[in-house]
Structure formats: structure tokens, C-alpha cells
Amino acid sequence: SKRYSLCGARVGFIVSKNSEFIQTCLKFALTRLSPPTLALIAANHALNSGEDYIENVIKEYYKRREVVINELSQIDNIKFSNPMGAFYSMIKLPIENAEDFAKFLLTDFSYKNQTVMLSPASGFYSSENYGKDEVRIAFVLNSEKLKNAIKIIKLGLKEFIG
């Protein structure tokens, strides 16, 4: 599903010569009933769109990644990864608690009546000691919206730190 920007659609396929494995997968599929109808329609369209569609999606995500990396580079005292395959980046912020910052953005901060919802990174690690000062930014918005979102993060961070 991610290959076609259908994250969350929960569609995909399995190919195997192992009949026992296929039977086990079928049991799981039957207990789940089926993916939502709209997800199936979208997946069918994506699968039949050809390689041009995939190439355009890849180009768009590369563009979004470059926008995010360039905009983040203009924020002092943060560290971030330049992902090679993921459509998100983890950002280490100069704060102790990213969850508090995320809440602050939602409840106490806005720029031109806009704010940003961030994912604190601690939920993406198996150890509770990791990611407390990190957030995850996904490249799901178009380039202009990503630029604006990072500007809001920059201004919000400045106000949050004081």
C-alpha cells in the first residue's frame, strides 16, 4: 500500500509456493473479513496505473524530502536524518520532552491561525529511553504545505524554548 501512497489502506498481496503458509494467511484474511471497499478500489486503480504513476510518485517524494531537508537545515540546534527510502524524517529537538512540545503546538501556539500536529518519536522506539526529544515528520503534504509546516515548527520551537 505504501508504494502507491495508500498508507493505512491495509491492502497488499502475498506470493508463496508454501501451501501451509498460504493456508495460515488465508485464516488471518478470513477473520479480518476484507479491506474497506474504497481501499480495494484505490488499490486496483494503483496497480493498473503502470510504471509512470510509480515514477511520478517517487519523484514527488524525492522533491518533498528535499524541501523538508532544506527547510530543517535552517533551524538552529536540531539534528535530523536524511532518509534514503522512508517518507519521513526523525528530528532531534533542543528540548527535553517532544510530547510536551507537540501538545504545546496544538493547544497554545498558532501562526496566522495555523499550527502543526507532530508525532513524538518515543512511540516509534522499543526502549522508553529513546526518542523523548525527537519528533517524526512525514512527507505526506505537498511541498508548499511542508514549507509552511516547518516554518510553524521553527516559530513554535522558538516560543516553546523561550
Predicted regions and their residues:
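PLP-dependent class I/II
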Residues: S1-G162
